[in-house]
Amino acid sequence: MKKQLAVFLCALFCALLILFHPAATDAAKEGFLVWRDSVMPSLLPFFVCTSLLRQLGALESGNAAALFALAFVSGAPGGARLCAQYACDGEAKDGTQLLAAALNTVSPMFIVSAFASSMLGTPGAAVPILLSQLLAAITAVFFAKRAYGVHLSATAKEASLPLAHRFAASITEAVSSILSVLGAIVFFFVAIRLIKETGMLHLLLFPLSALFPGLDAAAAEAVFSGMLEMTAGAKALGSLALPLRIKSSLGAFLFSFGGLCIAAQSLLFFPVSLKRYLPFKLMQGLLSGMICYLIFPLCFFGTAQAGSVTAETLGRNAVTAGFIFAVSLLGTAAVMLYSAILGKRRRRK
């Protein structure tokens, strides 16, 4: 059944690519430009450095603090990429999978330079976003280690090679990895555009619109896009006419969740189980968004709009905050329901 469904979806996707070829081409170009201008400059240098450190054996001891620091600085899918050396024969324990998920956070360089400075036009907004992402990631790592007693040890020793050879191999590995990331970004940019062109987006967002009548449609579309492809959602958030506090909180949610695109990128490097990965990341994103909303006044003393705060503004902010909560819970419920169905089928077999 799963195979037939996958074949049907692939055939449908190909048909939509033909029917909406101009829009799909524009979306692919947009995804490539986002990768070229934002993702590749922030990730490639760190991919080279982390690859070299791994080949030098710096992470063989499984030092969690060093792993966390490298993953946080390099950005997603750095967590999955760094944890790949702890998988044995293409498989990983549940705790290691959750640890890789917790370490998949967006690069601070992207948040500061691309999102806060370029998209929001307010560099100071990066402070509460980074703090909330850091606190949510630390909480998630602590949970993974406490709940599963994660013990990290490299499954294979790196071969002894001259430093020059290791450096060359690190560059080759980093370029290959960043090109794989490009493929995932372009695919999801095109998928989002096709969903919009076919009108399916309004259908998918209808339950949320009915639940929250005052919800801004553009904000709903931005968050939905971000849950598929994080950079697309971040770009859409930057153009919204919402208070800076709300946009920052929504951004923090998306950056800690990462979206399906980063989940797909993680699969390129590490054997994560999506039925564990996605609910865990949804909760991490929800926690990050709430933390950002709470600490924003303490970290950022500017104001996002002129004039007094009206009841309408407070109501819109409350609805948007509720939307973050609803999206996370609905997404978690859907993924958990799917996981439960899969589990029952496996037990029957």
What are these regions, as identified by a protein language model?
Residues G149-E173, Q305-A311, G315, S339-K349:
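Intrinsically disordered, low-complexity non-transmembrane regions of multi-pass membrane transporters
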Residues I171, V175-A252:
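Transmembrane helical segments that form the transport core of multi-pass membrane transport proteins
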Residues G62-L120, A222-L240, K247-F270, L278-L282:
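Alpha-helical membrane segments and immediately flanking helix-loop junctions
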Residues Q4-A15, S42-V48, I138, A154, ...:
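Hydrophobic mid-bilayer segments of alpha-helices in multi-pass membrane transport proteins
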Residues E91-G95, M109-F110, I138, L244-L337:
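C-terminal transmembrane helix pair
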Residues I18-K29, R54-L59, S113-A114, L120, ...:
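Transmembrane helix-loop junctions in multi-pass membrane proteins
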Residues K2-E60, A174:
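N-terminal signal-anchor module of multipass membrane proteins
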Residues S38-L43, A125-V141, F323-S328:
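Alpha-helical transmembrane segments
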